[in-house]
């Protein structure tokens, strides 16, 4: 593998560990736990793994353990730091007994089911330390939900002598880890299952999980790009830049990037929903900022838009729900078939309620057509294909044109469009993510050594220096509730949305009027790996505000 100068230098970085993990540990058990919701239902579904205590690791006595093998899976979308979770797990497992082996399942959970794997040796591991990406073993989106998958999994786990399986993933992947842990415990198969919290979207966090790994690096990567655009914007002074940011279920990325770069406008999906804003309300909000800046002679600006915004607008959310219903054949659960596009559009317009039809017809013709026609195999509208940034800029342009005729607007409006998503998913991890991920993996090895299953590896107090971080584990059942998914009630980990009464949003809300009027841009620049700690080791603004005492 040919390497860049940065890769070569970065490989020498030794991630920092919490003090408790720097030697032998003992597991200190807290009180019994309950799920965040639907306690009786979750307890009935997970009788073997429900109610377990929170674990905290402290310095302990050294003990000899017999050799054992561990399996690891990367599940779902990539996030910076995945390789460091594996390197921390590798080093942790080897420190317990040099004869221990680590096996990686190829291309995600599908590798477990299809018996595709590789042994991760020290030579292989050293090629991937402190690098971005999931390419050491690849990732996949196969869901581990069915008994036949679990049974195929146990076949290969037994063949390889694997005692524990570590699943690195987001809320859905860790939900599957919880189900798998319960199944293997119920069957007394003797295989432990441990989860590690991953997602750049930042929606896998709660009182126990301060942040999911990769969020720090991804937001710093996007913020560098946004800062570059803001500087260009303030240099040419003739464009409004509409920037869509990854994050379909929650607006954590948009909020964090706004805190880092201070754009003129940042939309927060959760606020749009809470205020029951219409699409026209959103457009008017942006257009007002454009008009106010134009009145000061500033015909330029930046707008940050969360990827999932359109699904949070109540009227459109209601429309999409009905479209999903009418475009699905109730007999088969599959997408309805039509002779052609026009027949399909006519069917939709005749089938949906009048209020939803009015919303559909208020949209630009091509967007309305897209909502009617683009479906997945189950008949669901493919909302992610809608270019929200272009939709909003076109509607803003139309509103400004109308205001100009009425004498309410005197400026010029020209838009540029950007979507930042994949640019941040495989970036080389920041020092924070390199340390945090390595600690998560090393910590997982200690949960395994202490015989735990159905736990998520957790590192807390991460705004402090790494030596002061707190290592331990949390029962995954503690994060579960029952939600409606694909027409059925299912146990799932509750997604963490932006809290409108939380410190990060409140700080943003206190500043946004000033940022809308003034050109108060901040230019974070690229991620730094060497230099002063205030440049290299800072956590996200979100975490700093949440943890401020």
Positions of predicted regions on the chain:
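N-terminal phosphate-binding or glycine-rich loops at protein starts, especially the Walker A/P-loop
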Residues: 1-18, 63-113
């Amino acid at each position: 593998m040919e390497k860049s100068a940065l890769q070569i230098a970065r490989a020498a970085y030794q991630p920092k560990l919490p003090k408790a993990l720097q030697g032998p540990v003992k597991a200190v058990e807290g009180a019994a736990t309950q799920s965040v919701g639907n306690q009786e239902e979750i307890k009935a579904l997970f009788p073997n793994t429900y109610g377990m205590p929170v674990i905290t690791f402290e310095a302990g006595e050294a003990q000899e353990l017999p050799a054992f093998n561990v399996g690891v899976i990367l599940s779902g979308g990539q996030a910076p730091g995945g390789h460091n979770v594996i390197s921390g797990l590798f080093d942790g497992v080897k420190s317990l007994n040099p004869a221990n082996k680590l096996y990686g399942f190829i291309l995600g959970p599908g590798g477990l089911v299809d018996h595709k794997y590789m042994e991760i040796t020290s030579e292989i591991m050293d090629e991937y330390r402190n690098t971005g990406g999931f390419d050491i073993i690849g990732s996949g989106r196969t869901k581990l939900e069915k008994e036949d998958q679990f049974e195929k999994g146990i076949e290969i786990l037994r063949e390889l002598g694997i005692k524990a399986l570590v699943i690195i993933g987001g809320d859905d992947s860790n939900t599957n880890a919880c189900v798998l842990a319960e199944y293997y415990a119920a069957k007394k198969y003797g295989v432990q299952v441990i989860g590690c919290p991953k997602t750049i979207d930042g929606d896998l966090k709660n009182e126990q999980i301060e942040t999911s790994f990769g969020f720090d690096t991804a937001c710093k990567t996007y913020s560098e790009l946004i800062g570059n655009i803001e500087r260009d914007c303030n240099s040419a002074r003739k464009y409004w830049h509409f920037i869509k940011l990854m994050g379909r279920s929650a607006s954590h990325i948009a909020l964090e990037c706004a805190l880092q770069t201070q754009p003129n406008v940042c939309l927060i999906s959760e606020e749009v929903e809470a205020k029951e804003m219409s699409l026209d309300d959103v457009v008017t909000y942006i257009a007002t900022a454009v008009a106010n800046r134009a009145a000061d002679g500033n015909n330029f600006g930046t707008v940050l838009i969360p990827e999932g915004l359109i699904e949070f607008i109540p009227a459109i959310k209601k429309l999409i729900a009905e479209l999903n219903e009418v475009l699905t054949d109730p007999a088969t659960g599959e997408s309805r078939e039509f002779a052609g596009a026009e027949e399909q559009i006519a069917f939709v317009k005749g089938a949906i309620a009048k209020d939803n039809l009015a919303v559909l017809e208020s949209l630009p013709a091509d967007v309305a057509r897209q909502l009617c026609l683009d479906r997945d195999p189950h008949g669901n509208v493919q909302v992610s294909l809608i270019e929200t940034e272009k939709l909003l800029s076109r509607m803003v342009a139309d509103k400004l044109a109308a205001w100009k005729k009425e004498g309410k607007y005197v400026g010029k409006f020209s838009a540029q469009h950007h979507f930042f998503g994949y640019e941040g998913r495989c970036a080389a991890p920041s020092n924070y993510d390199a340390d945090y991920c390595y600690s998560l993996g090393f910590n997982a090895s200690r949960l395994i050594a202490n015989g735990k299953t159905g736990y998520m590896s957790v590192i807390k107090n991460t705004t402090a220096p790494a030596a002061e971080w707190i290592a331990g584990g949390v029962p995954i059942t503690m994060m579960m509730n029952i939600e409606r998914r694909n027409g059925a009630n299912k146990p799932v980990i509750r997604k963490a949305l932006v809290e409108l009464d939380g410190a990060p949003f409140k700080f943003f809300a206190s500043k946004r009027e000033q940022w809308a009027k003034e050109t108060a841009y901040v230019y974070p620049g690229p991620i730094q790996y060497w230099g002063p700690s205030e440049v290299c080791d800072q956590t996200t603004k979100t975490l700093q505000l949440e943890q401020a005492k």
